[in-house]
Swiss-Prot record:
Organism for this UniProt entry: Arabidopsis thaliana
GO cellular component, one term: extracellular region
Ion transport among keywords: no
UniProt-annotated location(s): Secreted
Disulfide bond annotation, renumbered to this chain: 39-80, 43-67, 53-78, 57-79
Alphabetic keyword roster: Antimicrobial, Disulfide bond, Fungicide, Plant defense, Secreted, Signal
Pfam families: Defensin (PF24552)
UniProt record similarity statement: Belongs to the DEFL family.
Signal peptide (from-to): 1-28
Coiled coil: none
Chief localization: secreted
Protein name, as recorded: Putative defensin-like protein 48
InterPro entries registered for this protein in UniProt: Defensin-like_dom
Length: 82
């Protein structure tokens, strides 16, 4: 193996390490937590989803709204928050 081949593999290795670090950093995005005190309507796929929830929450004076549940066993509801 020549010196050029070693240098090429070294650069590929460095690029791979740098790329994997970026993936880890971007996948660690912080999830915004909100209170479940303002959960109203059940979300049903194809009938009442995130868009409808957002509109309803905006009409109630909230800045945000999305379909969420506290645990996997709980039903998914439209929860509003600021």
């Amino acid at each position: 193996m020549g010196i050029k081949t070693l240098i090429i593999f070294f650069h590929i290795f460095i690029l791979a390490v740098l790329s994997s670090n970026n993936i880890i950093l971007t996948s660690g995005a912080e999830i915004k937590k909100f209170s479940y005190d303002h959960c109203f309507h059940l979300c049903v796929a194809g009938e009442y989803g995130s868009n409808e929830c957002f509109v309803d929450c905006a009409q109630k004076g909230f800045w945000h709204g999305d379909c969420a549940n506290r645990t996997e066993k709980d039903p998914i509801r439209c929860c509003c928050y600021n």
